[in-house]
Amino acid sequence: MKATLYTIECISNLHVGSGQDNDGVIDGLIQRDVVTDLPCINASSLKGALREHCEEWNKNHKEDEKKVNVVKLFGKKVGGEENCEAGEYRFLDASILSIPRPSVNAPFVQVTCDEVVTELQDKASLFGVGLGDNEEKTILDLANVSEQNKCSYKDFKKYSNNDELPVIARNCLENGVSKNLWYEQVLPRKSRLAFFILHDDGEINKAFDSAITSVPVQIGANASVGYGICVIKKC
């Protein structure tokens, strides 16, 4: 078994909903890691978005060498859950790497913390993914964070909690009259995440890699209003 590491940069605001009921002001919360409570994209949501993207890619690329073998890599369903066939690739959750914060010296700066860096180091070590001689610097580069913009874990948790992340009001109008007003939490644009794909020994499929890294990928809800446009890069 081998692993390949990818990063996600949010070009527009991202809403991958948790699907959980919320009694607070925010109607639609984003997904969070069950242990750290930091923002994430669950593996099932990520896999679904990448599968849909690859299916669209195939429609626009007729050459066999550019087509992604979706069934082979992602698996298939035949008439119900009991007849599912697993694909060759194992998708892990996309974990938060960094989030943007306002700055007096620039429009914004990316911030992260040592705990986030260490967790990615540990995963890379577990899966045998090399990060170079200076692993911390490599991860900070992936996160687009300078050393001086690392913050404490306490502050990073604060910056990513429900009170700090952006909340956008959505309104359903009928003949100019509001019929349904709701509030959605988003992971702000410029946020960065990282995820691993586990696969058989050897390099990751070239057609798949090209499909997800050569053009933007839409992840999550509300594509019609520009949410979820992301750039994915292989590390």
What are the residue ranges of the model-derived segments?
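RNA-binding basic/glycine-rich loop and surface signature characteristic of RAMP-family CRISPR effectors
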Residues: M1-C235
